[in-house]
Curated annotation (Swiss-Prot):
The gene is pgi. GO terms for molecular function: carbohydrate derivative binding; glucose-6-phosphate isomerase activity; monosaccharide binding. It comes from the Bacteria. Keywords: Cytoplasm, Gluconeogenesis, Glycolysis, Isomerase. NCBIfam families: PRK00179.1 (NF001211). The keyword Cytoplasm applies. InterPro entries: G6P_Isomerase (IPR001672), G6P_Isomerase_C (IPR023096), Phosphoglucose_isomerase_CS (IPR018189), SIS_dom_sf (IPR046348), SIS_PGI_1 (IPR035476), SIS_PGI_2 (IPR035482). Catalyzes the reversible isomerization of glucose-6-phosphate to fructose-6-phosphate. This is Glucose-6-phosphate isomerase. The active site is at E340, H371, K500. One of its GO terms (cellular component) is cytosol. Pathway: Carbohydrate biosynthesis; gluconeogenesis; Carbohydrate degradation; glycolysis; D-glyceraldehyde 3-phosphate and glycerone phosphate from D-glucose: step 2/4.
Amino acid sequence: MFQDLHALHTRTSGRRILDLFAADLRRAERFSADLGEMRLDYSKTQIDDAIRAGLIALCDRAQLADKREAMFAGAPINETEGRAVLHTALRNLDGGPVHVDGAEVMADVRLTLARMRRFAEALRSGALPGAGGAITDVVNIGIGGSDLGPAMAVLALAPYHDGPRCHFVSNVDGAHIADTLRGLDPARTLVIVASKTFTTIETMTNARTARDWMQRGGGDPERQFAAVSTATDRTAAFGIPGDRVFGFADWVGGRYSLWGPIGLSLMIAIGPDDFDAFLRGAQEMDRHFQSAPWEKNLPVMLALTGIWHHQICGHPSRAVLPYDQRLARLPAYLQQLEMESNGKSVAMDGTALDQAAGPIVWGEPGTNGQHAFYQLIHQGKQVVPCEFMVAARGHEPDLAHHHRLLIANCLAQSEALMRGRPLDEARAIAAARGVAGDELERQARHRVFAGNRPSTTLIYPRLTPAMLGRIIALYEHRVFVEGVILGINSFDQWGVELGKELATSLGPVVDGTESAAAKDGSTAALVDYVLAHRDTDLT
């Protein structure tokens, strides 16, 4: 499948990226793709015209255009679960009808969005108060796709907050909910329980704890709880009125669900109008993905760059480095989006893959990461392709000098990764500091940077609701393109099941009501340790 590209890699792996710029003064322009004022610059990679042509050929060989059309048309492309993949319908604000199994779904999508809008507006205005007055705080309880997306987006769009404060609880560790609820008023807090099945053990454990906390503190759970779930029988049994339950269809996967009711906390924080702008930004990326030629298509070129670095060059990970503190949760969000989607070892037809599908995705916001792991990125033996992102302008005009420093650092890091520092330059630096003789050579070698390390840069005017929508949709479609080329199902997640099953069986063992004798030696010994130490007074 990749033979021609491997041959190109063999022929070009020794050249310097800097030389590509010297040979082509228009390289930055020719190896970028734009959507309006958003630009993806992938020129600081080894990709040239021949490599790009070879990568684009993968799209045609994998019938990407047909599979893209099938996804948007509601075909059951999630073959292992027999489901359509239509998170794009949730942001189809002014598009045409969308059908699943012959039924038009946009009427329900618009109805749900209108219900969310009315609920959010009433909550924000004080028309839906808690037992102690207008709601001041919202606690979203969920995990995975029910937490990572809204938590990331609420933080990212902090400059647009004009509603109640939003908090997020995901971990079943009691410390998480205890720390979150501490200081909140139980009579003026809304709790949103986000679980499609309303059975997720972490979420339901936290939900019951929050309900008890609210009842003890004078709140009214019937007025102050809402749910995002399709299990209306379970939400009713929990005590949540039907008019406060917001559902979504099984053709919306959890990690793709931010655009609908899972985004209720975001709508409450920023308001329905800005939430609409968020959806419109994503819809703009959808239309771009559907219409732009491959070489100018942002999701396609971001995906092909990823394929080149992981499948062809053999780099096992990639770092997502947003130079925006408010995007601090984006790397974790993309970890789920990419690693849960494409962390597969079996092709769509059930045969084993002959190499890893998705890479390890990790990262931190700049400039913090520069003082943590950039040492390895610059001078480690392994190459880590980096994906920088930065806005030309921040939201704090009186702190514009901060933002200029932020941009300078972002651009400097991508340049330094490419440029490096040769030994003769390192020797000159050491000599200028008064180092001489054998010590000069030793010191110089510590100051050598290999350079020639690839990176992309996503740059845009400002992080607005619409721009955040574009960014998230860009990465969603990137995952889809990579999955199509690799021949895998990007929309199931069987890898999360086994651990959940074993955790359920271990519950009684950890409680001490069942024996650990049937477990392996290590697990049994760890259980024995827990039972022996958990009641020990450590004060």
